[in-house]
Structure formats: C-alpha cells, structure tokens
A protein has these predicted regions:
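Active-site cavity-forming subdomains of large catalytic enzyme subunits
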Residues: 1-193, 197-203, 209-211, 235, ...
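A glycine-rich phosphate-binding loop feature that marks nucleotide/adenosyl-phosphate handling sites
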Residues: 1-5, 31, 52-60, 106-118, ...
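Conserved phosphate/anionic-ligand binding catalytic regions in large, soluble enzymes, centered on
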Residues: 1-8, 92-132, 192-203, 246-262, ...
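Structural signal for hydrophobic packing residues in well-ordered secondary-structure cores
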Residues: 10-18, 36, 40-44, 73-76, ...
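Glycine- and acidic
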Residues: 17-18, 70-78, 202-214, 235-245, ...
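Catalytic alpha/beta core of large soluble enzyme barrels
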Residues: 132-133, 226, 230-231, 301, ...
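Active-site-adjacent structural elements in folded domains
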Residues: 185-189, 236-247, 260, 264, ...
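Internal maturation/activation junctions in enzymes
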Residues: 219-241, 267-363, 434-435, 453
Length: 490
C-alpha cells in the first residue's frame, strides 16, 4: 500500500467514474505489511512512493522492510506523498465493501511462515488467495563480453566500479569501459526467466474423512497422487515446468467442514468447533509432512530442501502466536495425538519431496459434485442456487433433516470474527493459506465492524482473505454467484 497511485488502484472496479480508468475484469489485491497496520492502529502518517524509486520494498518484509521504508521516508531526493494511515485504511475497506476487492493479503504473515525463505520471497498470492509460494519476475542481466571470449554478468542495477574509478549501475556501463584491466568488447542483455507458482490441488472431504484413523489412511495416498501430477502434467510454458519441478509444490486442502460439523451436531463458533478443526487439521498436517518425507526417501528430495525451514525442523505450527495457541487447549498447551519431535528428526534426516504442502481452495464446483459443502465455509443458506462457470445449480445442504437443520448456520447469520478465529486455528497447521470469504449483511455493516474483522485477521497471523460478500437483508436473493472464481480452484 505504499504505491503513490494507490487511490486510483482502489477505484479500478468501481461502477462509477471515468470508464477508461476502470478494469472490471481484473482482480486486484493489496499486499499489506505490519508497518502499515501498526500505523493505522496508532493513527499515524503513511508515506506513498513512486515504485521506481523504491523497487527494493517489493522483496523486503518484517524488520528489513520497516527499516528501509523509514530510510526512504527521510530521503528528500525522491517523490513521495504523505497521508493519514487511518484515512487510507478507511478507503481500502470502503472499496472492499463496495466492490468485493481488492483482496487483502498480509505480506509479513506470509513471508514469516514461508518454509522456503532461504530461496526467495513470496511476492503475491493467486486469484483465490490460498497459494503462497516463492515467485520471481522475468528480468534481464547485463553481460560483459571481453575480447578473449570470457564474460561476466551483473544485475541491471548492480553497482560496478570500472577501471576509471567510476561506480555506476551495470546498465550504464558501455564498451568504452574496462574491468580489471580488460577492455569490454561487447555489452549484451541476457534474459533470465523468473519463477511462477503452480497450483497442484486436491481436497480431503471432511464429511467422510474426519477421524485420526481415516486421515492416517487417506492423506499419504493424496500426497503421492499430487506428487505424481507434477511429473505427468502438461506444461505450456517451460519456466512453469522448471519452477514446478524444482519446488515440487502441492496444495492439499479440505472441503465439507460445515457438513462434518452439522452431522456431528457441533455449532459454528463453539469451543467444540474450534477443538474439532484443530484436531482434524493437525492430523492432516502431520500426515502430509510425513508422507512427503517418505516420498523423499523413495524418489528424492526437492531441489531446494537444504536450508529450508523443513530441513531445520521448523513446521507451520511453530509460527503460531500466543493468541492463536490460546484459542484451543485440548489438554495441556499443545496436547497431541502425534509424535512431532520424532517427525522433525525424520524430516531433517530424510528430507522432503515437496517444498509446499497444504492450501485450502474454494472448491465451489467439486464440493457440489461430491455432495458436500464448500471448503471451510459455513453454508450460504440451507437451500439456494449456486451460480458458477457450470451455470445455475440448485443446491440443498447435504443430509438436511430436523436433526441437522439448526447446525447448518447460514454464513450471514454468524459474527464474522468467528470465521477469522476458526481460520487462525486452521492456519496454525497450514504452510500456505486458505481461501477465506467474509459474509456481511448491509444492516450489520459498519467501518468499525470491518476494521475489527480485518485487524483480527492480521493479528492472528492469517495470510489473506478472499471476497467480502455483502447482502441486503430485504433482498430475498437465493443465488450465490461464484462465476468469477479461478477455474482451477473450483
């Protein structure tokens, strides 16, 4: 949110205003950082910059970002604009409420928990905001070729001291210069392909698979299947194939949470709900990591394993803060049915087959096909019409009966902080993210309520939220439009 054109960015999907300055078919997102959120809380000043003067901010996070940002604020030689952080935050939330975007993603939360922080940085998420993997844009290097045929390459903005004693960016060096006593014969640009994240997704149906024994049996097979997809897939772009083969990233998620809760007569937002999903997600996390480690013995480690958090025995739950841990206490601070220390030793010894493991996709189509509820969401209503890329589909919640009716709480009837807390419990066990929608009726909407929801999401360590879905209480609209979701995540 430090881009000097952020106000125009926030207006991209508005229906009013100059149409040439709108982009209705794009899905913008904001990459929010801790420093901005802290200044919103403190009602402090926020500085906007020209991105060409501050390119390095895109790859920094945490204390490194804050330190560099504050240095740039003091730099009088670059273009900047000062605004009230709270006013900008209000505009962000207003745009989010009016248009459903920009999606809000939390840069520092994502990168702090990045299992492959040794090999790059997470710069963004995907359309459905559950994929968090290292990416890198295509770029050019400057290649100096000497008369002998030898060559050396530098990044375009990397400072080079030529023999005349002048220090300048590599892109400013010419064939009239010399390096190390060698005249430069030719200066060329060489293209370097970046890294593109890939979604290799599957979901465990919690309405059928929700006990320790069932998860122990099913998850290793799911991990093996997803790993096979990487090798068997068709890749239209070579750099996508290279990235996928190098990181071997998969995204095992869940669907059917609402059905599982209803059939077990558990109300949304109760402590029983929190305990149940904590138990289930722990089992999925443990078995996913263990299965990937076993595959590493059989097929080999992924190329970037050495130096990763996996190699150091650091797992997703190690990033959970005290507030999240205190949401669930299953007997002792971290009571568990699994031997986590043994698994850490195993992973450090055997390695991992896959660099990224878990991500919860929206599953708006496959959940209907399999006869369960969508992903991790409460139901839209007990009966409604689902509009997605397949058309308009009549839907009734699974196994609706007098016994389950009360436990299928419609999403718009819930306090949305419950969804945030439940997501934080899941996030404790997920190395990537979740596609998390927020549901608000107009009679409940207020700036204070929206601020409470999204501030809580940031504080509890969530990496993203998806759509902010709003509905007027007077309008009897039984159609839930999901047609704008990513095809791969449906």
């Amino acid at each position: 949110p430090w881009h000097i054109d952020i106000n125009d960015f926030l207006d991209l999907k508005k229906n009013s205003g100059e149409e040439r300055r709108r982009a209705h078919d794009l899905f913008p997102a904001l990459w929010l950082n801790d420093l901005f959120m802290e200044r919103v809380q403190a009602d402090d000043i926020w500085t906007l910059f020209d991105p060409y003067d501050t390119r390095e901010l895109a790859t920094l996070f945490g204390e490194d970002f804050s330190s560099r940002y504050e240095e740039l604020e003091k730099n009088e030689s670059i273009i900047k604009e000062k605004v009230k952080a709270k006013n900008l935050w209000k505009k962000i939330l207003t745009s989010y409420f009016e248009t459903g975007s920009p999606f809000l993603c939390f840069k520092d939360n994502a990168n702090r928990a990045n299992p492959n922080d040794h090999y790059g940085v997470i710069r963004s998420s995907n359309l459905c905001t559950e994929i968090f993997q290292n990416t890198e844009p295509n770029h050019y290097k400057i290649k100096f070729i000497f008369e002998s045929g030898e060559s050396i390459s530098y990044e375009e903005d990397e400072l080079v001291t030529v023999d005349s004693g002048i220090e300048k960016p590599a892109k400013k060096v010419t064939a009239l210069d010399s390096l190390g006593g060698l005249p430069i014969y030719v200066v060329e640009k060489e293209k370097v392909d970046g890294a593109t994240a890939v979604c290799n997704l599957a979901s465990v149906n919690l309405s059928r698979i929700n006990t320790k024994e069932e998860i122990d049996r099913i998850v290793p097979t799911a991990v093996r299947c997803l790993d096979n997809v990487i090798d068997l897939n068709f890749y239209p772009i070579e750099k996508v194939k290279r990235t996928n083969m190098r990181s071997r990233s998969i995204g095992l998620g869940v669907m059917g949470e609402a059905q599982m809760l209803a059939e077990q007569e558990i109300m949304w937002g109760t402590q029983e709900h929190f305990d149940k999903i904590d138990e289930v997600m722990e089992a999925i996390c443990y078995n996913t990591i263990s299965a990937s480690s076993d595959l590493a013995v059989e097929k080999g480690q992924y190329a970037e394993f050495q130096g990763s958090k996996w190699s150091r025995g650091i797992f997703p739950q190690d990033h959970a803060n005290a507030e999240v841990i205190n949401l669930v206490d299953r007997g002792g601070l971290f009571a568990s049915a699994y031997e986590w220390e043994e698994l850490r030793t195993k992973v450090k010894s055997q390695g991992m087959r896959n660099g990224y493991l878990m991500a919860v996709a929206p599953t708006s189509s496959i959940s209907i096909l399999t006869g369960t509820t969508q992903a991790i969401e409460p139901v839209f209503k007990r009966k409604w019409f689902e509009e997605n890329l397949s058309g308009l589909i009549p839907v009734v919640v699974p196994n609706l009966s007098p016994d389950t009716y009360a436990y299928y709480t419609p999403a718009y009837d819930l306090n949305q902080t419950i969804l945030i807390k439940a997501a934080a419990i899941r996030q404790k066990w997920i190395d990537q993210g979740q596609s998390l929608n927020i549901f608000i009726t107009l009679d409940k909407a207020s700036g204070k309520y929206l601020n409470e929801i999204y501030m809580l999401a940031w504080k509890l360590g969530l990496k993203s939220t998806y759509y902010l879905r709003s509905q007027s209480p007077e309008v009897k609209n039984d159609v839930e439009d999901r047609s704008m979701e990513c095809v791969g995540c449906q």
